[in-house]
Curated annotation (Swiss-Prot):
Region (Suppress the PT region-mediated translocation to plasma membrane): 686-694
One example GO MF annotation: calcium ion binding
UniProt record similarity statement: Belongs to the RASGRP family.
Biased composition (Basic and acidic residues): 1-12
GO BP, sorted A to Z: B cell activation; B cell proliferation; cell differentiation; inflammatory response to antigenic stimulus; mast cell degranulation; natural killer cell activation; positive regulation of natural killer cell activation; positive regulation of natural killer cell differentiation
Domain Ras-GEF: residue ranges: 205-436
Residue segments, region Ras exchanger motif region: 57-110
GO CC annotation, single: Golgi apparatus
Residue ranges covered by zinc fingers (Phorbol-ester/DAG-type): 541-591
SMART domains: C1, EFh, RasGEF, RasGEFN
Protein name: RAS guanyl-releasing protein 1
EF-hand domain span: 470-505, 506-532
Name of the coding gene: Rasgrp1
Length: 795
C-alpha cells in the first residue's frame, strides 16, 4: 500500500474512456517537465488505425465499407492490405446492421457478380466470408438467423455449381477446430510445483486466499468474448448474456461472502480478526493487480452492515483503518474513478480491470457518438473507438495469471461463494449481532461507497444440478485431504473447521458413528446449508401463525415474555418456535421441522418420562429435536421413581455444535413463579453461560452451565436464554431436590456413556420392531383391498 501515496504524487495522464477536465490539464501543465503528457496506448493504436484507413476514417457509406473489405483479398485469398478494417467491420457491424443482414448484402453482391460474369469478385466475396467464419466463428454458433442465412448462401453457391466456393464457406469445421475450445480450456499456471494448502478459512493465509480468488475471477473474466461485449452494447444490459452475468454474480457473491464471514463471528474481537484478514487479502489483490475482486472485497468491508458495527471497529487497529481508507480512495468514483484509472494505466502484464467501470465507458461512448454523420455516412471513428476499447479488454485474457491454484480449495471457494442473501437479510444479521437499541427497528441499508451501480440487482440463476456438482466436487476434496485412513468418515472437529469457511450454516449434523461424519451426511449438510438452494424453494422457512397460549411462554428470539390475554404471539406449526409479532420477521434461525412422532408439545405436557428417555441432539436413529435448546418428551410413559432415574445426565448440542454435559436432578417448582426475576435482574447475564431452567422454576433454582468458546464458533445467532420446559404430576404433592450441577469423574462419565449407548440400542430394537409391524400391517391392508376387489368382480 506504500505505492498509493506515490501514485497520487505522479502527474495525471489522460486515459481512454474518460475526458480530462480543465483541472487535470492545469495540473499536467504545472509539472516540472516541459513536455506534454504522453498519449495512452489505446489512443496511439486508434490513431494508427485511422491513418491506415485513409479517407474511410472520416466516414463512409456501408456499401463502400463492404466493398473495401472485399477488395482486401487478392486472387489467391491473401490479404493485400491491412486487416484492421476487416476486424473493425466484422466485430462492430452490429451497431449499424445485424449479422444476418450483412451476410444478405454479401449474397446480393454475389448474385450481381454472377449476372455480370465476374468470377473474381465472387471468389473474393467467398474469401471474405471464409475470413469471417475463421476469425469470428462464435457468431455462427450463437446467432440462429445468421446460421439460417448462411445455409441459404451455401445453397445459392451449390446451385451455380461452384464447388471450390462451397469449400470456402463451409461451416462444418467450426466444431472440429482447436480454437473452438478456447472458452473451456484450463488456465495454465506459471509454476509446475504443486503445494498443499489448508481448506480451513482460519488457517488460510491472505496470500493464498487472494490468489485463489484471483484464479476464480480470471477464469470467469476470460470467458467473456467479443460478442458478449457487443451484446451488452446493443442491449444495454446483461440479459441473455450468461458469461457476463456469471462474472457480475461472482463479484457480488464475493462482496456478500466477505460481509457474511465477518458477521458469522459471535464476538466483536472475532469479527475484527476476520475484518483485518480481509484487509490483508485486499492488499494482496492490489499487488496481483486484480482490481475487480479488490472492488468486491473493499465494497463488502465498506457496506453499511459492516461499517455500523461500532463494537467491532473498536477492536480494529488504526493502521488497518488507514489501509482501508487508502483502498477506498483508490476505488472511489470521484472524478469518474480517476485514481483507479491512473493506477490501472500504470500496471503492466497480468491485470484484471474493474469490469463495471469499463462497461460504463462503453455505454457512454456508444450513447455519446452518433452512428451516422450528417451526410448519412457511417461514423467510422465511433466503430474504431468501441473496437479499441473492447479489444483491449479481450487481449487481457491472453496473459496468464502469476499464480498456482489448488483445485480442492477452488472447489471449496466455488461452493461457499454461491451463497446469496438480499441486502435486507444481511442487514438484519448485522442488527442481530450489534443491536442499536432494543426498540428501534432495523433501518434500510445504504449503498456502500465503492460498489458500482451496474453490479446491483444481478443474482445468479443456478439449478439443482449445478449446485449438486459444486457440492460433490467440494466433498471429494474434503475427503481426499482429511480422510487419511480412507474409511469414509471424518471427525466432528475437522468438519466444524471446514464448515467455518461458510458464512452461515443452519442445520445440525447427524452422525452414523459417534464423533464421525460420513460422506453422505456432509453432502446433505452442504446441500441444505446452501442459500441458493433455499432460494430455489427448497429451503426451510417458518410457518408462523398467531396463537393464544394457555400457559406463560417466552419468545425464542428475544427471550422476552409473551404478554396478553389472547393471541399473545406467533408459533411455527412446523418447529414450534414462539416469538413476538415484532420478532417474527427478525428470526434468523432456520425452521427445523419435527419428525411426526407421538411427541407432545410443551404447552400440553402433563407427565414426564424418566431422564433416560432424553436423547442427545444430532444422534441418528433417535428422536430429532425440533430446534436447538429444546427437548421432546414421549407421552404415555410411566414416571420411574428409582434411584437411577432421579439423577441423570443429558447432553445438549449448543449452537456451536459442541456438546455441553449437564447433570440434572429432578426438581419441582410452583407454577406461579415463571415471571419472577432472576439473580441477574438489573445487570447483564454472565458471559459464556447458558441458562437452563424451567419456566416454572423459582429464582433460587436457576442453573448456570459454563460453555467455553469454540475455536470455530457457529455463525448461528445465540439466543439470550434457552429454557427447558418440564413438569411433574407430583409437583403439587411433594417437593423434590433442586437442580444440581457438579463436576463428575471420568468413571461417572464412562458409566453415563455406557448407559446412553444401551438406551440407544434398545430404542433401535424398538424402532426395527415397529417398522416390521408397520410392514406387516401394510401387507395385510393390501391383501384386504385385493380380496375386496376380487369379491366385487365375482359378484
Amino acid at each position: 500500500m506504500g505505492t498509493l501515496g506515490k501514485a497520487r504524487e505522479a502527474p495525471r495522464k489522460p486515459c481512454h474512456g474518460s475526458r480530462a477536465g480543465p483541472k487535470g490539464r492545469l495540473e499536467a501543465k504545472s509539472t516540472n517537465s516541459p513536455l506534454p503528457a504522453q498519449p495512452s496506448l489505446a489512443q496511439i493504436t486508434q490513431f494508427r488505425m485511422m491513418v491506415s484507413l485513409g479517407h474511410l476514417a472520416k466516414g463512409a457509406s456501408l456499401d463502400d465499407l463492404i466493398d473495401s473489405c472485399i477488395q482486401s483479398f487478392d486472387a489467391d485469398g491473401n490479404l493485400c492490405r491491412s486487416n484492421q478494417l476487416l476486424q473493425v467491420m466484422l466485430t462492430m457491424h452490429r451497431i449499424i446492421i445485424s449479422s444476418a443482414e450483412l451476410l444478405q448484402k454479401l449474397m446480393n453482391l454475389y448474385k450481381d457478380a454472377l449476372e455480370k460474369n465476374s468470377p473474381g469478385i465472387c471468389l473474393k466475396i467467398c474469401y471474405f466470408v471464409r475470413y469471417w467464419i475463421t476469425e469470428f466463428w462464435i457468431m455462427f454458433k450463437m446467432d440462429a438467423s445468421l446460421t439460417s442465412t448462411m445455409e441459404e448462401f451455401q445453397d445459392l453457391v451449390k446451385a451455380n455449381g461452384e464447388e471450390s466456393h462451397c469449400h470456402l464457406i463451409d461451416t462444418t469445421q467450426i466444431n472440429s477446430r482447436d480454437w473452438s475450445r478456447k472458452l473451456t480450456q484450463r488456465i495454465k499456471s506459471n509454476t509446475s510445483k504443486k503445494r498443499k494448502v489448508s481448506l480451513l478459512f482460519d488457517h488460510l493465509e491472505p496470500e493464498e486466499l487472494s490468489e485463489h480468488l484471483t484464479y476464480l475471477e480470471f477464469k470467469s473474466f476470460r470467458r467473456i468474448s467479443f460478442s458478449d461485449y457487443q451484446n451488452y452494447l446493443v442491449n444495454s444490459c446483461v440479459k441473455e448474456n450468461p458469461t457476463m452475468e456469471r462474472s457480475i454474480a461472482l463479484c457480488n457473491g464475493i462482496s456478500q461472502w466477505v460481509q457474511l464471514m465477518v458477521l458469522s463471528r459471535p464476538t466483536p474481537q472475532l469479527r475484527a480478526e476476520v475484518f483485518i484478514k480481509f484487509i490483508h487479502v485486499a492488499q494482496k489483490l492490489h499487488q496481483l493487480q486484480n482490481f475487480n475482486t479488490l472492488m468486491a472485497v473493499i465494497g463488502g468491508l465498506c457496506h453499511s452492515s459492516i461499517s455500523r458495527l461500532k463494537e467491532t471497529s473498536s477492536h480494529v487497529p488504526h493502521e488497518i483503518n488507514k489501509v482501508l481508507g487508502e483502498m477506498t480512495e483508490l476505488l472511489s468514483s470521484c472524478r469518474n474513478y480517476d485514481n483507479y484509472r491512473r493506477a490501472y494505466g500504470e500496471c503492466t502484464h497480468f491485470k484484471i480491470p474493474i469490469l463495471g467501470v469499463h462497461l460504463k465507458d462503453l455505454i457512454s461512448l456508444y450513447e455519446a457518438m452518433p452512428d451516422y454523420l450528417e451526410d448519412g455516412k457511417v461514423n467510422v471513428q465511433k466503430l474504431l473507438a468501441l473496437y479499441n476499447h473492447i479489444n483491449e479488454l479481450v487481449q487481457l485474457q491472453d496473459v496468464a495469471p502469476p499464480l498456482d491454484a489448488n483445485k480442492d480449495l477452488v472447489h471449496l471457494l466455488t461452493l461457499s461463494l454461491d451463497l446469496y442473501y438480499t441486502e435486507d437479510e444481511i442487514y438484519e444479521l448485522s442488527y442481530a449481532r450489534e443491536p442499536r437499541n432494543h426498540r428501534a427497528p432495523p433501518l434500510t441499508p445504504s449503498k456502500p461507497p465503492v460498489v458500482v451501480d451496474w453490479a446491483s440487482g444481478v443474482s445468479p440463476k443456478p439449478d439443482p444440478k449445478t449446485i449438486s456438482k459444486h457440492v460433490q466436487r467440494m466433498v471429494d476434496s474434503v475427503f481426499k485431504n482429511y480422510d487419511l485412513d480412507q474409511d469414509g468418515y471424518i471427525s466432528q472437529e475437522e468438519f466444524e473447521k471446514i464448515a467455518a469457511s461458510f458464512p452461515f450454516s443452519f442445520c445440525v449434523m447427524d452422525k452414523d458413528r459417534e464423533g464421525l461424519i460420513s460422506r453422505d451426511e456432509i453432502t446433505a449438510y452442504f446441500m441444505r446449508a446452501s442459500s441458493i438452494y433455499s432460494k430455489l424453494g427448497l429451503g426451510f422457512p417458518h410457518n408462523f401463525q398467531e396463537t393464544t397460549y394457555l400457559k406463560p411462554t417466552f419468545c425464542d428470539n428475544c427471550a422476552g415474555f409473551l404478554w396478553g390475554v389472547i393471541k399473545q404471539g406467533y408459533r411455527c406449526k412446523d418447529c414450534g418456535m414462539n416469538c413476538h409479532k415484532q420478532c417474527k420477521d427478525l428470526v434468523v434461525f432456520e425452521c427445523k421441522k419435527r419428525s411426526k412422532s407421538p411427541a407432545v408439545s410443551t404447552e400440553n405436557i402433563s407427565s414426564v418420562v424418566p431422564m433416560s428417555t432424553l436423547c442427545p441432539l444430532g444422534t441418528k436413529d433417535l428422536l430429532h429435536a425440533p430446534e436447538e435448546g429444546s427437548f421432546i418428551f414421549q407421552n404415555g410413559e410411566v414416571v420411574d421413581h428409582s434411584e437411577e432415574s432421579k439423577d441423570r445426565t443429558i447432553m445438549l448440542l449448543g449452537v456451536s455444535s459442541q456438546k455441553i454435559s449437564v447433570r440434572l436432578k429432578r426438581t419441582v417448582a410452583h407454577k406461579t413463579t415463571q415471571t419472577e426475576s432472576f439473580p441477574w435482574v438489573g445487570g447483564e447475564m454472565p458471559p459464556g453461560h447458558f441458562v437452563l431452567t424451567s419456566p416454572r422454576k423459582s429464582a433460587q433454582g436457576a442453573l448456570y452451565v459454563h460453555s467455553p468458546a469454540s475455536p470455530c464458533p457457529s455463525p448461528a445467532l445465540v439466543r439470550k436464554r434457552a429454557f427447558v420446559k418440564w413438569e411433574n404430576k407430583e409437583s403439587l404433592i411433594k417437593p423434590k431436590p433442586e437442580l444440581h450441577l457438579r463436576l463428575r469423574t471420568y468413571q461417572e462419565l464412562e458409566q453415563e456413556v455406557n448407559t446412553l449407548r444401551a438406551d440407544n440400542d434398545a430404542l433401535k430394537i424398538q424402532l426395527k420392531y415397529a417398522q416390521k409391524q408397520i410392514e406387516s400391517l401394510q401387507l395385510g391392508k393390501s391383501n384386504h383391498v385385493l380380496a375386496q376387489m376380487d369379491h366385487g368382480d365375482g359378484t
